[in-house]
Amino acid sequence: MKRDFTFFCRIWIGIPFFSGLVNGFSMSPPTLDNTKDQLVINANDTLNITCRGQRILDWSWPEESLSKVEFTDRQGQQSPTDTPGYREIRLKECQGVAGKPYCKILILTNAQANDSGYYRCFYKDIKAVIDGTTAASIFVFVRDPEHPFIKRGDNDMETIFITDSETHIEVPCLVSDPDLKVTLFSLVPYPEPVDGSVVTWNNKKGWSIPRHIIQNTSTFIGFYCSISVQNSQHTSSIYVVQVIGLKFYEFKLFPEDSPVELMQGESLVLNCTALVDFNTGVDFQWDYPGKKENRLASLQPLRNVLDEATEISSILSIRNIHLDDSGYYTCWANTLEMKRELTTVVIVHEKPFISLDYRNGSVIEAKEGQKSVRLSVKVSAYPSPEIQWYKNGKLISSKNSSRFKVQQHSLQIRDVCKQDAGEYMLVLKNSPAALEKRLNFTLIVNVPPQIHEKEAAPPTNLYGKGTRQILTCTADGSPPASISWQWRPWSPCDLERTRRALRRRGGRDQSPFCHNWMDLDPEHAVNPIESIDTLTQMVDGKEKTVGRVVIQNASVPAMYKCLAENRVGKDERLIYFYVTTIPEGFDIEMEPSEDPLEQDLVQLKCNADNFTYENLRWYRLDPQTVPPELDCKSLHQYATFLEGQLSFQTTSNNWVLQLNITNIQLQDEGNYVCEVQNRRTGVKHCHRKYIPVKAMEAPRYRHNPTNHTVNVSESLQMNCDVEGTPFPQLSWFKDNQPLHQISGILLQDSNRTLSIQRVREEDAGLYTCSACNQKGCVQSSATVSVIGSDDKTNVEIVILIGTGVIAIFFWVLLLVIFCNVKRVNPADIKTGYLSIIMDPGEVPLEEQCEYLPYDSSQWEISRDRLRLGKVLGHGAFGKVIEASIFGHDKKSSANTVAVKMLKEGATASEHKALMSELKILIHIGNHLNVVNLLGACTKPNGPLMVIVEYCKYGNLSNFLRAKREFFLPYRDRSPKTQSQVRRMIEAGQASQSEHQPSTSSTNPPRVTVDDLWKTPLTIEDLICYSFQVARGMEFLASRKCIHRDLAARNILLSENNVVKICDFGLARDIYKDPDYVRKGNARLPLKWMAPESIFDKVYTSQSDVWSFGVLLWEIFSLGASPYPGIQIDEDFCKRLKDGTRMRAPDNASPEIYGIMLACWQGEPRERPTFPALVEILGDLLQENSLPEIPFNVSQSSEDDGFSQASSRPPSQEEIRLACNTLPTRYYNCVPFAGCVMVGPSSTCHSRVKTFEELPMEMTSHKTQHDSQTDSGMVLASDELERFEHKHRGAMLTTATTGQSTDRLISCPSVSSSGSGGGLLRPVFFTQLSGQTFYNNEYGHLSEEGVSDYFSSSDQAV
């Protein structure tokens, strides 16, 4: 999806090639001098293995007790120590070869039996060790007749733990000789040999035993192995099998809302519930304020055995609660393997009360078109009072207007309009206690004009030639705006005049300067105009002016502009109308079927737009030699050229290269690639098509027809159950004579079923079914015997006629009743949706989705227009598939999209969840910088499909890591590029309109640009990515959505350097619960979470701002993992809360690092908003697009961080961020962004501690069988919850104190005029070393599918 006011960061000539073929450069794995999978040596021999590769190498070996000694050729080989029993592994550097410059030799002298095992050579600087990709291994057997078994310890008995779900048991009887014959014995309780036909032996792993062997006996004890070597019997350790239950599915403390508030004298009931696996014992312990004083409390245990787990509870009850009972109530659940705890706060009030005060003053100002305005108050009350809002003396109800939202104790008005101005009053009542409080507000509304399509529609679109198109501009203003239309021929705009206009207008123009505009006249239009209309419509409850131009026949590219103007101001929208016959310019069609059969004729057509491409060629990839990742440039090394028939379609101006495969065979199955060349750039692009071939199979009977004996006048049905490929043609014979369908004899289901409605005597005989296809024929016969006579009594006929008349009468009666039943009016349903979704406090958001309307005329796409491709990713209950979408005639070119659908066997609830996600995406609307909804397939004749945008370059994190070697801080900037960047910034900053959902479900076409893989990455690109993410988050925040997982892995990169935010379906409506508390344990990305989210489970738009700061760190570290080398434990969380922050990445300027620190403010209200971040990053992006400033130019001492070119006074947000734009780079003492505004000047905390300043202690936390920590990235569940409760306890018992830091630098005062030294380009330091971090950013805190935490999988896209 594109936006009409956006010029992309980098426009290069060319079209990106198919992403399924290119994923970056490939890397070959290391190679060993011994290419076999195993090596056998004798005891006391010397093991010598040489490894070569493309990167720095290292070795691993099975015997961990052996020490490692490394030396090079220059150091010489030192002799091993003479200490008896001392052995070591020696690693020696050696000379590399061409293509593999690194070499390392492993030397082990005096090898022993216990040295048997895998010896693995791997790339040292890559964390993922995978054989065949980043590593190479060989299994070495050290043959020792005296020690045939390998023992790693001194234990003669080992325990094998298994769970109920495991089907096999692995008994690790490892041997030192691969040719030994090992016998497996089971102790039941006496030794018995195990039947060798049911077990499997692997000389590298041991025995694999089916689970049922130990389930069939009650006296089973364990296993052991035996070997006879040189007339000597040897036995292994005894392996005892233990079945245990370890899973801790869920742990909750009810009520879940914290704090729990009560009135003195009421009863307190807390329920601590654990959902665990069978055979798991749980011991509950409670701690509460009155426990030490022996406060009378009752504990009631409960145990409930469910179908798949056991629910165990402990209920704490305290009657007649006192004020002294206020405090922390903690429940511990202990098992043999783990310990869980939950804490809630109980507050006991003495009497009812209401305390009320203003939060932001009594006078509130807003602008027309502003996304929302909030009337907020500070309220402290118990019990919860009744809330009433009045406007001009009239009660406000969310049922009367969907734009008014009462959330807790605040009133939010969305889509502010001039009618919202007036006097507002809040009334809080507690009728039983006779308490009432009131506050009055005054709302002032200012009105600017807006064109809404600028936020929802792309500026450039591809229009099919010969199609009817409608250009629309919707404007609102006060007074109503008038709309006029202009056009100009398709040609570049005047760049020089654009630059002068930008400077003259202060860098705030909304569109490029283009001259030669002419009024649009239907009589003299280059594209025939059907009509030009201007009308007034009610849109979202507001009166708006809509201008439409209906183009009867799109034939010539042109540029159109609509202008909306009133006496307050004006706005304009520029539309690039590009006409083409193939929207993508390049696609592949396969006829006549996507699933051909053996011996079919298959036609592959490669269609390419003649305006863009030439030199079409067909290739077939060799499946034996093609690498996993293939560049189009290296295609010829792994493919065979195929001759095709080239033709030119004059009417559509397209080239068609047709490849005919006659009489296709099984060996013809595979990947076929069409290669084309861009006419302007010469770059070659490829599309790949996989042809599956189904083998033909001869007909065969699954069940032969059976003999039948029936009475006269009864019905008879015979089935011919056959199968084959292709499906056979079926024929029936009676007494060797062909049988055809006549009255009373029916042949149904492609002749599979023969039905005789009323059997007669002459129907007896031999019936034969014959099935034939290209592979042959089969036939089978059955005898039908008829009993009785054809004579029928009149009584039977009368009964049949009477029964038919009665049945007809009842059917007519039911039809009349059904037609008179009152049906629900769809308009009533829509009204209900509008009232419910605006008050989710009464109905959960998930239930609201049932009322959300789905307009099939707008969003429904026929499944025939989709062609599914490869799977891009899997989710909890669904999958994402790459697909192509065609036009209505299925002959036009296809666009690439991503399709989200359910897996096979999905339940009704999963189907409902995907349908709810579809409706939520429709409700959120479209934006350039989010992954947008394109359409859906919901009709019942196929699977449910949700169609979204496809982003070919994958997620931003992987892209940045792959581009590290091609990172250049700066590059030459052409005037055209600088102008485009300026226009993009100004279009984003000047736009203040509400983001409206698009009414079009068509896929956005691709614009011709160079491949991003082939262009260098610059600082300007990094700032551009940051700017776009801020704009996308600004849009989501305007739709009242909180992301909660904003990270580079959830940012996708599309063509033209456009980034799109994904996984925002995980967000929740902010009005459902402002202090959103996640239920149960979940996967927590702690490195990206704000302190209030970690400690208090509070998620707001300001917590997303914190995550945005971490995302900035990722971008300017080129995809590095945040907090590198820091263990994520309790100490980390404590220091994060105390103000310790990450230091600046090497590629970040002081301005960028200042923005990071501002986003990491401990107090959420002090963090910048996303609109402010869009403004600031837009200015930085514009400055970085200017010509280079030499590195030796330094800032003056009077530089306050603001550009002199700006004629406006600095905003409060910019003044606060200016404190961080110091030219000096600090490492352990960095500038701190926490500025405090005092009159016209500002003061700052002068110093902030970073994680490098105070080394983190690398402590080890024992979490047996927890499976919740992953490479130190998150806390284990028990440690996290224990630390949260400790944090809450500290908050109640001690007053919060600010962190003391030494003042090193004073922040310069900022005058109200905002003048100061101009910003100079900062000196950036060396780029990152190229190390790739593969740490998993999550840790499992619950079993998948058990927690009620809503999750979405979406595109791998």
From Swiss-Prot:
Domain notes for this protein: The first and second Ig-like C2-type (immunoglobulin-like) domains are sufficient for VEGFC binding. The fourth and fifth Ig-like C2-type (immunoglobulin-like) domains are sufficient for homodimerization. The fifth and seventh Ig-like C2-type (immunoglobulin-like) domains are required for autophosphorylation and further activation.
Protein name: Vascular endothelial growth factor receptor 3
Assembly and interaction partners: Interacts with vegfc and vegfd. Monomer in the absence of bound vegfc or vegfd. Homodimer in the presence of bound vegfc or vegfd.
InterPro entries: Ig-like_dom, Ig-like_dom_sf, Ig-like_fold, Ig_I-set, Ig_sub, Ig_sub2, Immunoglobulin_dom, Kinase-like_dom_sf
Binding positions for ATP per the UniProt entry: 872-880, 900
Principal subcellular localisation of the protein: membrane
Keywords: Angiogenesis, ATP-binding, Cell membrane, Cytoplasm, Developmental protein, Differentiation, Disulfide bond, Glycoprotein, Immunoglobulin domain, Kinase, Membrane, Nucleotide-binding, Nucleus, Phosphoprotein, Receptor, Repeat, Signal, Transferase, Transmembrane, Transmembrane helix, Tyrosine-protein kinase
Function: Tyrosine-protein kinase that acts as a cell-surface receptor for vegf or vegfc. Combinations of multiple VEGF receptors are required for development of different blood vessel types in the embryo. Involved in angiogenesis, specifically in VEGF-induced sprouting of new blood vessels, but not required for proper vasculogenesis or hematopoiesis.
Naturally occurring in which organism (per UniProt): Danio rerio (Zebrafish)
GO terms, molecular function: ATP binding; growth factor binding; identical protein binding; vascular endothelial growth factor receptor activity
One annotated Gene Ontology cellular component of this protein: plasma membrane
Boundaries of every Protein kinase domain copy: 866-1181
Location in the cell: Cell membrane; Cytoplasm; Nucleus
Top-level taxon in the UniProt lineage: Eukaryota
Post-translational modification: Autophosphorylated on tyrosine residues upon ligand binding. Autophosphorylation occurs in trans, i.e. one subunit of the dimeric receptor phosphorylates tyrosine residues on the other subunit.
Glycosylated residues in this chain: 44, 48, 114, 216, 271, 360, 400, 440, 553, 610, 660, 707, 711, 751
UniProt similarity note: Belongs to the protein kinase superfamily. Tyr protein kinase family. CSF-1/PDGF receptor subfamily.
Catalytic residues (UniProt): 1045 (proton acceptor)
Record lineage: Eukaryota, Metazoa, Chordata, Craniata, Vertebrata
Activity regulation comment: Present in an inactive conformation in the absence of bound ligand. Binding of vegfc or vegfd leads to dimerization and activation by autophosphorylation on tyrosine residues.
Residues where Phosphotyrosine is found: 1071, 1076, 1226-1227, 1334, 1338
Residue intervals of the Ig-like C2-type domain: 25-121, 138-244, 255-343, 352-442, 453-583, 583-690, 699-785
Signal peptide stretch: 1-24
Biological process according to GO: angiogenesis; atrioventricular canal development; cardiac muscle tissue regeneration; cell migration; lymph vessel development; lymph vessel morphogenesis; lymphangiogenesis; lymphatic endothelial cell differentiation
Topological category with respect to the lipid bilayer: Single-pass type I membrane protein
Catalytic activity: L-tyrosyl-[protein] + ATP = O-phospho-L-tyrosyl-[protein] + ADP + H(+)
Known EC number: 2.7.10.1
